[in-house]
């Protein structure tokens, strides 16, 4: 257990062999937090030799594609990753420095935030990454979210984005848009095409927490509904259709589905 939600210690990435019951250190990272580590994950489409993880090198955040069996770093990307497509070709990322100030357990401390004095920065907040050639493309700004189906409580609030997640087919992604008006926090769930077009305000009843794609057009979320209260709702993307699951459960959690969506 760590007392700091964004520790400054170096993190070791371990590979556990369940057949031989051995443990090996395959990499280290200087950018991590207690909620999501350094985003270390197996890289598709094979998910058996390569991992990708975030690090801080030469004064900059980056992400590293590593073959865990040869130890060869196959590519160093100039930005960190947040969510990765299952085909291993595309990723999305956000501003980890602003996230660190507004939610330290999810951000990284290494690089000072350049938007700290701006409540609604006219600056990029989501980027698209080509993992095959390293190209990084700006997608959306904070102002894009603040001006999209704007509510009165957004106008003088401080804005951030978090919890990016690509759909299983990699064509759309979801993101939590959050804003703070005094001590009050508001959250809505927005979905969008992978190129930043066709934004859709899927859930805007003040609170959305943990979410998961069940399929390419269905999302399960713990959220609030004005006519149903907090709970788990399965929503169909780009529609107003939803089903309230397990009405007797009102506590927040981390929902997930099996690969085929049956469990």
Please name every model-derived segment.
Residues 2-7, 56, 114-120, 153-155, ...:
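Short consensus segments that form the blades of beta-propeller domains
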Residues 9-10, 25, 200, 223:
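Catalytic phosphate/metal-binding cores of nucleic-acid and nucleotide-processing enzymes, i.e., regions
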Residues 28-125, 139-153:
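Asp-box/WD-like beta-propeller blade repeats and closely related beta-sheet repeat scaffolds
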Residues 15-36, 67-80, 132-159, 191-208, ...:
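Multi-bladed beta-propeller domains
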Residues 1, 37-51, 82-90, 163-172, ...:
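Blade-terminus and WD-like Trp-Asp/Gly-His loop motifs, strongest in beta-propeller folds
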Residues 228-230, 246-263:
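Loop/turn-rich, solvent-exposed surfaces of beta-rich toroidal or solenoidal domains
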Residues 153-231:
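Beta-propeller domains
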Residues 6-14, 59-65, 101-103, 122-127, ...:
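Structural motif
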């Amino acid at each position: 257990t760590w007392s700091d939600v964004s520790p400054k210690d170096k993190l070791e990435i371990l590979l556990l062999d369940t057949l031989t019951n051995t443990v090996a250190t395959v990499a280290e990272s200087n950018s991590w937090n207690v909620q999501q580590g350094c985003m270390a994950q197996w890289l598709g489409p094979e998910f058996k030799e390569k991992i990708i993880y975030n690090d801080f090198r030469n004064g900059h955040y980056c992400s590293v594609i590593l073959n865990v069996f040869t130890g060869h770093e196959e590519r160093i990307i100039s930005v960190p990753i947040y969510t990765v497509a299952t085909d291993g070709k595309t990723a999305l990322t956000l501003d980890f420095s602003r996230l660190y100030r507004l939610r330290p357990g999810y951000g990284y401390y290494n690089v000072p935030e350049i938007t700290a004095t701006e409540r609604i920065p006219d600056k990029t907040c989501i980027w698209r990454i080509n993992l095959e050639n390293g190209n990084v493309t700006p997608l959306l700004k904070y102002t894009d979210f603040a001006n999209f189906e704007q509510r009165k409580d957004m106008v003088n609030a401080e804005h951030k984005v978090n919890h990016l997640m690509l759909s299983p087919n990699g064509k759309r992604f979801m993101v939590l848009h959050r804003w703070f008006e005094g001590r009050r926090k508001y959250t809505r769930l927005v979905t969008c095409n992978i190129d930043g077009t066709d934004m859709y305000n899927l859930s805007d009843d003040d609170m959305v927490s943990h979410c998961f794609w069940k399929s390419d057009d269905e999302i399960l979320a713990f959220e609030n509904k004005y006519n149903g209260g907090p709970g788990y709702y399965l929503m169909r993307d780009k529609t107003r259709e939803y089903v309230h699951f397990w009405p007797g459960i009102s506590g927040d959690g981390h929902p997930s589905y099996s690969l085929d969506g049956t469990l």
